[in-house]
């Protein structure tokens, strides 16, 4: 489900007139107290859109008929955009302000974009998130991304991260720099020599790499030597 809504549907043979949706950590309701009544159209369509949900949260929805639970389902909402970040709408806006970047940066990407010519993240950046907007993953080309200072996290979400040449996604190569965390979630990664190549970055042994819900294609196919794979 998206970050803030979910569609709950049930079989045509099941009668439902109310529902309760709550975090899965909450106890199972004893009755229909506080339940939301379905509209005539929702009853006829055997489906309802549940609004006002929190991102990255597991919920259980209980379907009721005549005051009794008749069905239930558990789901987890998708991630939501981080708060407290300076947001740039598109890679072009980010590049235009590149030398002034600092603090927490959120880049919202809704169309295919090329960032391969801007590989050195400015030293004043603390966290940077590349956020793919929409149901279809926008393509983002990056090349040997690194940081000029100490950065807490580089994150990619809902993107098709594609190589244009014989590169890695992230390849720190600056003395005195460090990366604490790299997160790649709900992305497609394709045609890279490797994902992370460690070279001269300090503290490389403590770097945490988290790849979750991703498709990886043709990893290492561009490599002509031994340093290719997830991490080199």
Give a label for each model feature.
Residues 10, 164-176, 190-211, 217-232:
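Glycine- and acidic/polar-rich repeat regions and solenoidal domains
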Residues 4-16:
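Conserved aromatic anchor
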Residues 110, 131-133, 157, 162, ...:
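Feature marks extracellular polysaccharide-active and adherence modules
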Residues 3-4, 114-130, 137-180, 193-203:
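Extracellular beta-strand-rich solenoid/capping regions of secreted or surface-exposed proteins
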Residues 20-54:
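Recognizes extended acidic, P/S/T-rich segments that occur
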Residues 79-120:
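Acidic Gly/Asp/Thr-rich repetitive segments characteristic of extracellular carbohydrate-active
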Residues 50-71:
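Beta-strand-rich modules
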Residues 104-106, 112, 127, 153, ...:
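Detector for repetitive beta-architecture
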């Amino acid at each position: 489900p998206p970050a803030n809504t979910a569609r709950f549907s049930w079989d045509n043979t099941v009668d439902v007139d109310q529902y309760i949706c709550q975090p899965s950590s909450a106890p199972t309701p004893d009755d229909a107290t506080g339940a939301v009544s379905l509209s005539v159209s929702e009853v006829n369509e055997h489906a309802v859109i549940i609004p006002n949900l929190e991102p990255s949260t597991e919920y259980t929805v209980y379907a009721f008929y005549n005051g009794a639970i008749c069905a239930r389902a558990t789901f987890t909402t998708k991630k939501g955009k981080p708060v407290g970040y300076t947001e740039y709408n598109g890679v072009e806006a980010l590049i235009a302000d590149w030398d002034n970047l600092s603090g927490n940066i959120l880049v919202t990407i809704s169309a295919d974009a090329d960032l391969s010519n801007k590989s050195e993240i400015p030293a004043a950046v603390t966290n940077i998130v590349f956020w793919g907007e929409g149901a279809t993953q926008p393509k983002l080309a990056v090349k040997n991304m690194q940081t000029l200072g100490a950065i807490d996290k580089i994150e990619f979400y809902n993107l098709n991260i594609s190589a244009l040449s014989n590169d890695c996604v992230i390849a720190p190569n600056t003395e005195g720099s460090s990366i604490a965390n790299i997160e790649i979630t709900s992305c497609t990664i394709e045609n890279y020599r490797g994902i992370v190549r460690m070279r001269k970055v300090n503290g490389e042994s403590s770097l945490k790499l988290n790849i979750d819900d991703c498709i990886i294609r043709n990893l290492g196919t561009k490599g002509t030597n031994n340093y290719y794979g997830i991490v080199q």
